[in-house]
Amino acid sequence: MKKRLLALLLALVMVVGVMAGCSKKGTSDTPGTSATEPGSKPSADKLSQPEKATVTAKYAYKAEFKDITAQFEWINQICAAGNSVYLSASILGEEVTETDEVTGETYTYNNYRDGLFRLDMETGEATELENFVMPEIPEGWQGGTNVYHMQAAPDGTLWMLVNFYTYRYNVPEDFDPATDQEYNYYEQGEEKSSLLHVAADGSLIAELNIQPERSEEQQYYNSISTFCVDTAGNVYAGDWQYVYVFDATGKQLFMLDCSENGGSLCQMNSDTVGIATYVYDEATQTGGQRFLPIDLATQDFGEAIKLPQNAYNFFPGDDVYDLYFDNNGNIFGYDLETQTQEKVVDWIECDINSNDMNGYAILPDGRVVAFLRHWDSAAGESTTQMVTLTRVDASSLPEKTAITLACMWLDWDLREKIVDFNKTSERYRIVVKDYSEYNTEDDYTAGMTKLNTEILSGKVPDLFLLNDQMPVDLYAGKGVIADLYQFIDNDETLSRESFVQPLLRALEKDGKLYEMPTSFYIQTAFGLNKVVGDYETWTLADLKDAMTKLQPDATVFNVYNTKSDMLQQCIARNIGAFVDWTTATVSFDSPEFIALLEFANSFPAEFDWENYNWQEDDNTQARLNSGKQLLSLVSFSTFEDYLYQCYGYDSGIRFVGYPSEDGTSNNSFYTQTGFAISAVSACQDAAWAFVREQLLGQKQQVENQSIWCFPVMQDAFDRMLEKAMTPEYQYDENGEIMYDENGEPLKWPKMTYGGGVSIAPDGTETQMESVEIYELSQADADVILDLIENTHSVYSYDQDIMNIITDEVAAFFAGEKSAEDTAAMVQSRVNLYVQEQS
């Protein structure tokens, strides 16, 4: 079995090789590799990309998809026993109709039950094993039973963890529903966890009651969710906070406390069971993910073993890897001795969207069986598919050119779109290289360092999925990424006017566009109109003048904003004012940066979160309205978000942003899911085809309410605004608009502000007024559009530059150095850094 599993995993790794990216024949099989010497700094002419994909593996996996015809709603658990695959699934039961004893209204709902199924691998037909019977709820009680975990035994039988709970409302004979509630008579009944040993036909072999013995303080943790069985028959059950160990008869041997961090029960091999948990070492003041083996002899945890910091959902190891784990939708193997990890299963390479996965199993013959549950929003229904991965000769698969996408974590929405692109494209497929997989608990930037090192050596990916860590300006200045206007200008459908113009202008660098986000939100600051509304400029002098209108002890922002907070936020919102990667120049010795330092220095050095005496009126709205605070930092991503955050302020508000030396409002865009294309890729047109796919469907996403930020496409943005300004009416069962007693149509509020009960420190309760907002007004729309029109910068964070600044300003914040001397040192060090990188 171990050898077969190893062969399977190694062959799955080879899928990546089969789909290798655009590398020229005869060169390295690493996607996007050139012949530049390692460690050298390439010029644009040295950066090269491939012409065609190269087949580098003998074997690959072919995915076969089949619809599951069984009448169950969803799959709970899956495991393989021999060549059979078993499913624990929820089945739609009978429809129940009940009548409310108080109102007389009737309502219906469906019951569900758990069933055990055996799957026919050839047809996809799932047959329910009717010999399997779940524990029944006693008459007169309510409750439920759930299969939490399944594990196959070597002899083809199954172990199943079943949790059972009951309750009832034991109302008296004279119970009157008009004056009393049945919830006053709630009684909790029997609650237990059982381990069922089940034969291949579903019949019960044995049942072990593994109800733990707990103290009164431990009763809170009463839901065992997983188990392991070792070769001696000992059972290990866990509920995150505790691990309970039983012998083969179900007798509890001992219990272990997983500490305040909790622990996930996992089995490293047939005889080694323990927990994965976070451990902090006081001596070294370091911490990380650790495996704590359970020692049966000492009835305690053994010596901690280091695990990858991004490891979750563990699987037993074999003769190659000590254990396997999930990370970002893929499976990795881990070697404890060398403390190294390797990706062994990449679902995207098999055209499988792991977002939809219910579970998978590995068969002895090397096949992999996975189950996908996909919701079709158009049809309003979900479907279940079985996917069988079968090893085939790589040469039998259609050859496609690979587009290598570099990222620092792949979000779930984009994963689905990549799978769809790979399935439908006859010529290309996207190969994802997630550099976050190289991060360690000691170095969370190791992946970013590796990506930049590869770029410097000439290995440039075709496509970048951007995030805050990626230095886009540096890439643009070095000629690594392309001007996207060349693709937009030659596009048959799109033009520059297809996009939200203020955002594009803010993203431009010397008239060129190097990144394309799919959505954005606004970051700014506002104050009360009666306080900041009359200023024609917004400089530090203006801010200081506005502070004189407030209470003597008023703060600029909330009490918890510190010097370092303000410095980082101000620089990230406008770093382009101080660093120009195109010309490799910096200007930190400018009056603007000196003024920024002085502004940041006006805030407290730190904030004592633990000992601060919080008051009821410490919320931002109350502080602004009462004159205790000048400005509120705000980010909003939709028109409704604006309504939620910006209503309820005395005299209205005005967006002024951060103060600046030129007096303009310092607002910024924060972009989401941004793309950049390699300047030297041979797959530029195909890469752009994928990017434009993410843009063209945005208007439909607005209709479906499946986009959560302002869209970058102008037509989608306009439709989002139109929907926000359009009221939503209430309809009756005939589809007709409902009206109130005054003949006015009834609307659904887009937002409800206030309401509820306010409790003062002395216990006094005050009913708060509730305000419902039904649509965005034209005046509010004009405010938002004006704010977007007057936003000229994009939030950008360069960790290396920020580290230099943080290091140098420490003495200034401590009063040991002047702002001018600090600015001069920052100028010198950042200038040296920029020259080294250019």
PLM segments and residue spans:
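Glycine-centered hinge/linker elements that transmit conformational signals in sensory
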Residues: T583-D617, L643-Y644, S651-Y658
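C-terminal capping/gating helix-and-loop segments adjacent to ligand/active sites or protein-protein/ligand interfaces
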Residues: E733-V830
